[in-house]
Structures are given as C-alpha cells and as structure tokens.
Design a protein with these regions (language model features):
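A short alpha/beta connector and helix-capping loop motif
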Residues: 103-122, 127, 133
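C-terminal active-site rim and adjoining tail of enzyme catalytic domains
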Residues: 198-200, 210, 219
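Alpha-helical hinge/cap motifs
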Residues: 95-96, 111
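Residue-level signal for inorganic ion chemistry
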Residues: 107, 164, 220
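As written
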Residues: 112, 211-214
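Conserved N-terminal beta1-alpha1 strand-loop-helix module at the mouth
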Residues: 1-92, 99-102, 133-163, 171-178, ...
Length: 250
C-alpha cells in the first residue's frame, strides 16, 4: 500500500475535468469487448488499437476518455489505461468494477484523472470512502446508478463535486431501456452534472439526452465499432450541443 500510494502521488499530474456551465460533451470509451456484444475489436496489437482510438477521440474533442480495465468480460487491463494516459492530454477515467479504495489508488498510479464507481456494488459508506480517496488525489468521480434506489443510496456524496451517470442497460437482460434517462432526469440533483450511459448510438440519441438535461453522454460500442470513430464522435457532440442551443433559445 505504501509503495502504491507513493506511485500514485508521483504519477503524471491529474488532468482537470473542465466542463462548460451549460454545454454538452462526450466521454469516449475505449473497450475491446463487452458482455452484451462480445468481442468488438480483433487486432494483433490490442494496446496499440486502444491508443489509436483514444487519439481519435481526443482529436474529436471529447471531454474524457474512459478506459475499461476489466479483463474477463471487457478484455481490458491497467496497461491500456496507462498507455492511454501517456498518449493523450484530456482526462482519462478508469472504468471497472471497483470495490476498494486501493483500486482507486491503482488508477491514479496508472495515470487516471478520474474513476467510475458503481453505486450498487458497495455500501454507501464505502462509496463515500472511495469517492473521498479519489478526490484526495485530485481526481473526478463518476458515480453510476441504475434506478431510484441507487440514487437514494448515493445521497451521501451529493455534497461532493461528482458526476452522476444513469446507465440504461439492464444488468440481467443486458438490454437497453432508454426510458430510464427520462424517468430519472427530474430526480437528479441540479448542481451535479448528469451523464447518459449506454444506448447513445446516434445523433438523435445524443440530442434526446441533452434535451433531458444530461451534460454528457458516455459512448463506447457505437464509437469502437464505427468505420470512422472520430467523425461519429463529432456528430454526437454536435447533435447534443444543437439541442442545448435550441433549449437556450426557447
């Protein structure tokens, strides 16, 4: 633990998450596989492909790059995170099934500027501890929820500067339930940016999320499997920002 904490403290500096007050941005996700869709990328050098995707996302002006580090279902690892953090200048977030503050410190040691924490994986007290661990290193935290019960549970961290992600994928069936974004949007704290997760595949999806008040969308499969990931990223961001402009003008 002492050595890991020392590595985290001496790692590449955290890249601050800088979001405009009333805008729409994308978290571009790098992953090689998913439980819902199987293997997404077949290449001889997965690490290199991870870096290539990250650079395309960065060039398309994403706010954050999310990197899967879970090995069995997503074919990820911490090396992918570290390689991405070295290659880009935007914040990089570790996405995994994190259940211990040590894993947050691991992420920082590998160069992450943020972490995703799944609300229902831990008790509220542990979620708060992991959140505070990340914030203590200057990292941002995206707390992921699936329903109102999850939202109630994470009220212990509403006084921290976190992002709240609403995942529309049903964990049992793995099917996307887009209506969940609309159901939960009115209940999200006004002072915390909301993130639409899973199911944002088209400009129409991005526009719909933005109209509901979500400040970001986390998009993975639609970008990874696109023939032109950078251009797809740009279209999604532009659609969300158009929706914001229309809402502001009305």
């Amino acid at each position: 633990m002492t050595g890991l904490a020392a590595r985290a403290s001496s790692a590449r500096p955290v890249v601050p998450l800088d979001l405009p007050e009333n805008g729409f941005d994308l978290i571009g996700e790098v992953k090689l596989a998913s439980p819902a869709d199987g293997q997404l990328v077949t290449v001889d050098d997965p690490g290199r492909r991870v870096q290539e995707l990250a650079l395309l996302y960065e060039d398309a002006d994403v706010a954050v790059i999310s990197v899967l580090t879970e090995p069995s279902r997503f074919l990820g690892n911490l090396d992918h995170l570290e390689a991405t953090a070295v290659a880009v200048e935007v914040p990089v977030m570790r996405k995994d099934f994190l259940v211990d503050p040590i894993q947050v410190i691991e992420a920082r040691a590998a160069g992450a500027s943020g972490v995703l924490l799944i609300a229902r994986l831990t008790e509220a007290s542990l979620l708060a501890e992991m959140t505070d661990t990340a914030i203590g290193f200057g990292m941002f935290v995206l707390v992921e929820i699936f329903d109102q019960t999850d939202l109630d549970r994470i009220s212990v961290v509403f006084d921290r500067e976190i992002l709240i992600g609403v995942n529309t994928r049903d964990l049992t069936t793995l099917k996307v339930q887009p209506g969940r974004l609309a159901d939960l949007a009115p209940h999200l704290p006004d002072h915390l940016p909301g993130v639409a997760e899973s199911g944002v595949k088209s400009p129409d999806d991005a526009e719909a999320a933005a109209r509901l008040g979500y400040r970001l969308a986390l998009v993975g499969t639609a970008l990874v499997t696109s023939e032109a990931p950078g251009e797809t990223t740009r279209r999604l961001i532009a659609a969300g920002r158009r929706a914001i402009s229309k809402r502001s003008a009305s």
